[in-house]
Regions:
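Central hydrophobic cores of alpha-helical transmembrane segments in multi-pass inner-membrane proteins
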Residues: 51-59
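Short helix-coil transition sites and intra-membrane helix breaks within transmembrane domains
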Residues: 15-25, 158-166, 183
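Interfacial segments of multi-pass membrane proteins
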Residues: 28-42, 168-183
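Juxtamembrane transmembrane-helix boundary motif
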Residues: 1-14, 33-42, 60-154, 205-267
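Alpha-helical transmembrane segments of helical membrane proteins, especially in multi-pass transport
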Residues: 195-202, 206
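Transmembrane helix-bundle signature of multi-pass membrane transporters/permeases
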Residues: 14, 44-52, 88, 185-196, ...
């Protein structure tokens, strides 16, 4: 029963994640946390694998159909590659940071409370920015070193929180690179792909992969790919303003789940 429920959550989250460019993990992680039936490290790993599968499909399809002449790819290599490189480095740092914070608490649930609290604050800030973004003057960074630093910050946060990416990716891309919604969504998935790849590789190399139900992982990964396929298709057809509305509604839901999780972990 729980495997079926997890698959439904992963598929739905991956569809929405592919549409909005937030990866899906920002939904999967807090929702699975709310059920409170798996260890935090297991949820982080399974969520990361699902997000990686979804972004892998999205990025590969984007590169295949994305010759600049076709106009279908919105990833600019000049900024996209250093962002991805920074995200890869950040993925390693975020993974290490999570284990460091976890080691500070005898009760692992307290580490979950820290994650939920940070995600709540980040999502609230993202919501405020999204609502008032028309009044905010944005930047247009193109320097490679700056792109690497921005990517590293995003990669660190996503790996530490176990969410793959999340709304913060889009806000950072809006502000620092003056991207529109759909361009930011595609570049966000590109960043998430590299961040999650290095995080998962690091887990394998350091032999820190937690014990988990293999069948559940297989189903979640398949749902991640299926959700990515459907979400990418829907994203092409939806107007940018509808993507914005979905994004705002999603952030409100995420904040409510985070509040519940903080109360649940600390209660």
């Amino acid at each position: 029963m729980f495997t079926f429920l997890s698959c439904c959550i992963c598929f739905s989250a991956s569809v929405i994640g592919a549409i909005c460019g937030i990866g899906g993990g920002v939904i999967i992680k807090p929702v699975l946390d709310a059920f409170h039936i798996m260890d935090i490290a297991v949820i982080n790993f399974l969520s990361g694998c699902t997000v990686f599968s979804m972004t892998s499909y999205s990025v590969i399809r984007s590169r295949q159909s994305g010759s600049r002449q076709s106009g279908e790819s919105h990833i600019e290599t000049r900024t996209g590659f250093p962002l991805a490189l920074g995200a890869a480095l950040g993925g390693l740092l975020g993974k290490h940071l999570f284990f460091l914070v976890s080691s500070l608490f005898a009760n692992k649930d307290q580490a979950g409370a820290v994650q939920a609290s940070i995600l709540l604050l980040v999502t609230a800030g993202t919501l405020l920015y999204t609502i008032y973004k028309e009044r905010i003057r944005t930047l247009r960074i193109s320097n490679a070193a700056s792109c690497i630093l921005v990517g590293a910050a995003l990669g660190t946060m996503s790996a530490f929180l176990g969410i793959g990416g999340g709304p913060i990716n889009l806000v950072v891309l809006f502000y620092f690179f003056s991207m529109d919604t759909k361009t930011a969504a595609e570049n966000s998935l590109y960043i998430i792909f590299f961040s999650q790849a290095t995080s998962l590789i690091a887990s394998a190399v350091t032999k820190s992969i937690p014990s988990f139900p293999v069948l559940m992982l297989v189903f979640m990964v398949l749902c991640g790919i299926g959700g990515g396929m459907l979400g990418r298709s829907v994203n092409k057809k939806l107007p940018a303003k509808h993507v914005d509305r979905l994004f705002i509604g999603l952030m409100v839901v995420i904040m409510l789940i985070c509040i519940y999780n903080v109360c649940n972990y600390t209660g």
